[in-house]
C-alpha cells in the first residue's frame, strides 16, 4: 500500500483529501505543521509527501528544505499543495525542493 504524508493544518482540507485517497486505497499520515511533517517523514518514511505551504510553527517552504537536507528522507518526492497561485510561490516551492506544485 502506498503511504502518503499529508502536511496540512486546515481540517476541511484534511477531511476532503483523506476521504478521497483512502477510497483509492492509499495509507494516509497527517501532520498539522511543518515541524510535525519533518518528524513524521522520518518516523514513517512515506512514499510521497503532500505539503501545504502556509502552516503554523514552520511553513511548508522551510519544512521542505529541511526534509531535503535529511539523508534518510531527502529522496521522497514532495508535491506542494497551496492556494498561493503566483509564479513566485511556485518558484520558491520548487527551489525549496518540491518535485511539483
Task: Please give the residue ranges for each predicted region.
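Charged docking surfaces used in two-component/phosphorelay signaling
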Residues: 15-23
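The feature encodes the CheY-like receiver
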Residues: 14, 56, 74, 86
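Active-site beta3 strand of CheY-like receiver
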Residues: 44-50, 55
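Conserved acidic carboxylate
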Residues: 8
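Short hydrophobic/Thr-rich beta-strand motif most characteristic of the beta2 strand and flanking loop
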Residues: 25-32, 40
